[in-house]
């Protein structure tokens, strides 16, 4: 009986030693996992710093100082005994609480962190200045810089307006010739080629402008000659139009103008003279040729 009791006591002591070893191994493994998580956070922060070109919004030291490996004292798991030696456990206990070296041994294995190059953080922030305030929001800044002008109204033909304004500009052939004759005494060193290019560009622009003016009638000239022109058919003879209006008015037997927007003629006037006057007195603000000529 005494021999059996001694064997039981020895087995209990060995079980206690094995339990202590398992607890140390569990603490070792949990510390290694916590260090791996912290290394992942550190690499993610470094990638953000490299991609953003400046310091990340959260300081990289905050997760290192706040997060500490928990002491799993009361937990025991199925870990193989003898996996960690006491020297490795002591080295882990000394290194898992503070800063992390580049190489450390965990349970007989070496965790090697990738070599990191030091990033010059304060230099780009001092050079770029306010541009680093929102490194990820560069699209909004680009849109705000490009959209300072007023928005365009739907249906507005901007290209037609630009070309129309360019056609309305006076020609600069005479001014260019005068400038060339006045500056003929200067040496033709480096200014000869740009001047020749400018003259050729002006000639081609004037030719293109004349062609477009032949397609689209000159608005100012037509307004001076015929102040009441509205439609492209304004060049028709007035006599034929008045005869048509006379026939329509006689066939209907009433003195009103066939156009619904025209006012009724007075008693002393005929229907034939009322309708052309209404056409001539219509406002010339909207010009269908200048609006839809492209």
Swiss-Prot record:
GO CC, alphabetical: nucleolus; nucleoplasm; nucleus
Pfam families (UniProt xref): FAM212
Feature: compositional bias, Basic residues: 241-253
Compartments where found: Nucleus
GO molecular-function terms, A-Z: protein kinase binding; protein serine/threonine kinase inhibitor activity
The family this protein is said to belong to: Belongs to the INKA family.
PANTHER family for this protein: PAK4-INHIBITOR INKA1-RELATED, PAK4-INHIBITOR INKA2
Function noted in UniProt: Inhibitor of the serine/threonine-protein kinase PAK4. Acts by binding PAK4 in a substrate-like manner, inhibiting the protein kinase activity.
Protein's name in the database: PAK4-inhibitor INKA2
Organism: Bos taurus (Bovine)
């Amino acid at each position: 009986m005494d021999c059996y009791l001694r064997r039981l006591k020895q087995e209990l002591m060995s079980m206690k030693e094995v339990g202590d070893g398992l607890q140390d191994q569990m603490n070792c493994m949990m510390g290694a996992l916590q260090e791996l998580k912290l290394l992942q956070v550190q690499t993610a922060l470094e990638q953000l710093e490299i991609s953003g070109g400046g310091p990340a919004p959260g300081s990289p030291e905050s997760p290192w100082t706040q997060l500490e490996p928990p002491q799993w004292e009361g937990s025991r798991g199925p870990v193989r005994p003898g996996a960690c030696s006491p020297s490795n456990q002591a080295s882990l206990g000394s290194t898992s609480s503070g800063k992390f070296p580049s190489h450390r041994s965990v349970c007989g294995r070496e965790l090697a962190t990738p070599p990191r190059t030091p990033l010059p953080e304060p230099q780009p922030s001092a050079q770029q200045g306010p541009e680093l305030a929102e490194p990820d929001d560069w699209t909004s800044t680009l849109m705000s810089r490009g959209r300072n002008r007023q928005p365009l109204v739907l249906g507005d033909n901007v290209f037609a307006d630009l070309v129309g304004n360019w056609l309305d500009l006076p020609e600069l052939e005479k001014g260019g010739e005068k400038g060339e004759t006045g500056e003929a005494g200067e040496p033709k060193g480096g200014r000869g080629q740009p001047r020749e290019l400018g003259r050729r560009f002006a000639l081609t622009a004037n030719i293109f402008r004349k062609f477009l003016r032949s397609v689209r009638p000159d608005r100012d000239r037509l307004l001076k000659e015929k102040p009441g022109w509205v439609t492209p058919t304004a060049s028709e003879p007035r006599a034929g139009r008045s005869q048509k209006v006379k026939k329509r008015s006689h066939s209907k037997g009433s003195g009103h103008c066939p156009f619904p927007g025209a006012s009724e003629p007075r008693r002393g006037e005929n229907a034939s003279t009322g309708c052309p006057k209404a056409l001539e007195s219509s406002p010339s603000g909207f010009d269908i040729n200048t609006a839809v000529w492209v």
